[in-house]
């Protein structure tokens, strides 16, 4: 697969800059520790029980993180699309085995960031540290709390509409069974919600 590395590197840079100002010198240091990675649909990025070494920026494609219980039942933990980072944060931070698997739902172009080297850069560069703090606050605190509250306070239709507002084309790209699992409902429930919305539109 041929692709424009400069474009996707710039997409990653813009992602960083959306959280905090970063100098060109610091960005060059980041560029030195990234690698492009191609993943085919159905391939595994991170397996349950594997220790994560990298965090991945999604340039193109979609992935899901899923948990398998003792009975073999699978539950989607998250769905990741373009412009998002995918990885096991707990595994990266604690260097412990991941509790979930990350699988490609589409052919993907990813940028892999070596987390150990990335942490070294954070410790040496205040602008990268400011970005890291801002990213953690938004994604690991604010959005996590908002999603937990939504699971309790919002009904399934509201959660589905929120998902469509963030990702309008998701229902055309991701199998509905994965979307349903992500929302904490059954595929049958999601089908009813979609039919009801179609009738009212």
Model-inferred region functions:
Residues 1-8, 43-55, 109, 178-186:
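Short N-terminal helix-initiation segments at or just after the protein's N-terminus
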Residues 103-187:
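Polybasic "coupling" helices that flank or enter modular domains
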Residues 160, 200-201:
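Short, Lys/Arg-enriched C-terminal cap helix and immediately downstream tail that follows
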Residues 37-39, 80:
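Hydrophobic residues at beta-strand termini and immediately following loops
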Residues 1-35:
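Cyclic nucleotide-binding regulatory module and flanking cytosolic helices
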Residues 190, 194-197:
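DNA major-groove recognition helix of helix-turn-helix
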Residues 44-104:
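Cyclic nucleotide-binding regulatory domains
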